[in-house]
Amino acid sequence: MTMPKVSQMRDIAFDGRKMGYVPPKKLTISPKLRLQRKAAADIDPITYEVVRHALWHVNEEHGATIQRVSGSPVAMYALDLNPSILTEDGEFVYFGPYMQYMSGVTDTQVKWILEYRSDNPGIRDGDMFLANDPWVGAAHQQDVMLICPVFWKGELFCWVTNCLHQYDLGGITPSSFCGSAESAFEEGICIPPVKIVEGNEIRRDIEELYLRSSRKPEAVALDFRAQLAGDITARDRVLALIGRYGPDVVKGVMRRVIDNAEAAFLKKLKRLPDGVWRERSYVECCRPGDRGTYCVMLTLRKTGTKLVFENEGTAPQAGAMNATYSGWRGSIMVALNQLLCWDQYFCIAGALRHVEFDPTPGTFNCANFPASVSTAPIQAMEISLYPAYNALSKMIHSDPEMRNDIMCIGGTSQWPATIFRGTDQWDEPYGYILVDPIGGAIGAFATGDGISTGGQSRTPICKLPNVEHTEQTFPLLFLYRKEVIDSGGAGRYRGGLSAESCFIPHHTGVITQDTLSSGNAIPTSPGMMGGYPATTNVYKFKRQTDILERVAARRMPADIADLQGEDVTLQLRQENFEQRPGDVYAVIWSAAGGFGDPLEREPESVREDVDNRSVSIAAARDLYGVVITPDGRVDDPGTRDLRDGRRDANRKKDGRVARLKGERTLRITDNLVLYREKTGLRLACSKCAADLGAVRDNYKDHCVRRESDLSTANPNIGDYRRYIDDRPVFRQFFCPGCGALIENEVARANDPVLRDIELLPREASKR
């Protein structure tokens, strides 16, 4: 049964109660609240640049203040926070450079407050609102916002806000990542925006209500004060700017920042063809004991200067794997910001004037209340965010200048959560999540290789935590942390490698562990335009090993495989299993996807990869078609013969292949071009002009199709049957004329071939 989209549900109230809050085009704001809207239009360039950069630095100082006051691993090492500045009516001026999806849900919170709090209890100078309701605008319950209106002479001038992940806010699982919850009623406290600061005084009754459900109230109270300090700092800096330059000038700068961002965005869109771009990915295991796979669809439609994002075809909400409307929207905004708004200091408001989000409520990433959403940022939101990189990259590829901005899906595209708790070395209770997967990897570019352990692209300034700091804070001893050979997706440009962290308990008798993951059977970092997928997430667990004897003898292992012991297969939502001092636990996070056909990678680059232990000799041959001699050189004749033989094997063997000879009008992807023939617009191979069908066709239907196990795409991908029942496959689509690789896709064996690119003929005919 087809479920309706938001745009088709005209009689439904999207007010953040049952359905996620969808701000109307015109907000209903109480007349009690006076808004400062006057803005100077004539601002000299020097003043504009000074104030513009000052506002950016207000945001940076806001985030740094939270880090300094909190001092927690969440703020200092995970950088699981982000500040924002918004106009009086909730348009973004700036995102912060930390965890950017946190800002992506901020404008919905601010607009909801304007609509539902401006009358009662009112919005006044000296107030701040606390909020973590995902149906109003939060990633999940643990990401708490402190939202501060900034007033000037009795009028609401703008908003400064921040969001910070909290240690624990209740629920059935310590840390509040409730991987077995079936509804929000089993998760942490859920708070629609509530006035926690009134007249510059903390309301003790609201703070005590907020802290009561937490297992770590002291830590949450400290982080609340860190957020408070951040908002106060940002508010004071904005007021100082107003005092120096005047409210009209500062507001005028804000308006111009947004207007300039809009103009830059429109200029880019006008250079791109109209069309539809689709990405398909999968989530595994929505609750403990589940072996299912769940489809996640992203559709991007471009018509003129308007973009529309949809999720039609995504699986219905289920188990503990969901996200809300604001989470899905905020995730996509991160990719939109980084690929199309990076030159505007992450000011996405101008772009948002021309972007619509039209998901299907009741689905996995647009769930209705009271779905379980506490795991959203590490599962549902990541699987919503990362495919947007590929869809947007394919859209902008046709423009030679914008092609330089393309970035494939990065590492940790599904977070392999290792949630641990117990009593630490000081006999104090603790609970936390291993932050190491933040090290991620950056996807390949259209112009070069990705970045190994380069972080998560959703967090531009993220950093890998120090092993020593983790050991100091928690009762763990790391055995090693290393990059994983062959983990990056193969391609003309290789995706960045991911890494593996391995640890044992230290100065404690037992650690209670939970797993919470997806992307362990089906890779969630596929390549693009012929690039191969990266490795999956991997849990490795060995019981009763000889590690303590090795440590005593000063013989540290280089890998968990070096140890004697019992191998245990951990499931993706396994709860309350124990790790004792002789038990060794290793976690590998997914790497980044590759760009372009691996057979087109320079052989010398592959040799360097082998020298650097980025690629094994076997993978050099199997994936890249490069023969490495015993003394480490490239066997040039052997490499040419191997590559030519593979291309020849993938050509069409029966019948003649038509070649197009008309006008080549558009380079759609690295491997696909558009021709104008006498018979109309047709698609073709970029290498040999072999006919791949009319523009209205799915080009894949005209390719030679090969289907194989996922291990042929990446040697580190293991047996899917450990976790799921549906068989995933690696599909490849080759040119029938020359055997060149046109595109790949990862899919369940029974799923239809994806039409990932659909140019609109009217637009295509103009080019």
Task: Label the predicted regions.
Residues 2-125, 133-152, 156-655:
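Glycine/proline-enriched, intrinsically flexible loops and inter-domain linkers
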Residues 678, 682-713, 746-757, 761:
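Extended intrinsically disordered, low-complexity coil regions enriched in Ser, Thr, Gly, Ala
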Residues 360, 417, 757-766:
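Eukaryote-specific, cytoplasm-facing alpha-helical/coiled-coil scaffolding segments in long proteins
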Residues 679-680, 727-730:
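Flanking scaffold residues of small Cys/His-coordinated metal-binding clusters
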Residues 128:
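Glycine-rich phosphate-binding loop of nucleotide-binding enzymes
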Residues 660-680, 711-722:
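Short Cys/His-rich Zn2+-coordinating modules
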Residues 691, 738-741:
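Cys/His-rich metal-chelating microdomains
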